[in-house]
Amino acid sequence: LMKNEKLYFTQEIDEDVIDYVRNTPTCQNVVRQGNIIYVTKIPYMAKKYFREKDPKLKRYYYCHCPWVREAIKSDIKISSNFCYCSAGYEKRPWDVIFNQPVKAYVLETVLKGDLVCKFAIHIPEEYSKISRQLKGKRVNKSRLET
């Protein structure tokens, strides 16, 4: 993508963007700790975000939500609860995977002055129990094949 100067989901990609994704395990991937899955959004305007020094503009370039970006730009205070919309977006695939609604929480958000948006997705208890039972056990792959 970088060599061909093509956009990736409307974004220019350069080494700074690649380094960020590579060095932030929760970005574009997930990290599981216990029964919680952590997710960090990738900056919306990544190249501008990485080059920006002003914290306000950095938050502006980070956010995917046009309403929040305009609030940041215009110095309009809105509740960080507004970011539960993004938490809903992040949790939706997990609702499908676990075949039930999961709980999602906003841990960090540009609306609270953070420079990233990070979410916690709670794994349903019955799936946590299964993983605890399997922990340390070998799985016979032939039994998993259909």
Q: What does each model-found stretch correspond to?
A:
Residues 63-65, 83-86, 117:
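Disulfide-bonded cysteines in secreted/extracellular proteins and peptides
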Residues 83-105:
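Conserved short secondary-structure elements within globular domains
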Residues 22-23, 34, 74-75, 88, ...:
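N-terminal, helix-rich and Lys/Arg-enriched segments in bacterial and organellar proteins
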Residues 48, 81, 100-146:
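Short terminal or interdomain "cap/linker" segment that borders an active site or interface and mediates
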Residues 1-79:
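Amphipathic interaction/junction segments at domain boundaries or subunit interfaces
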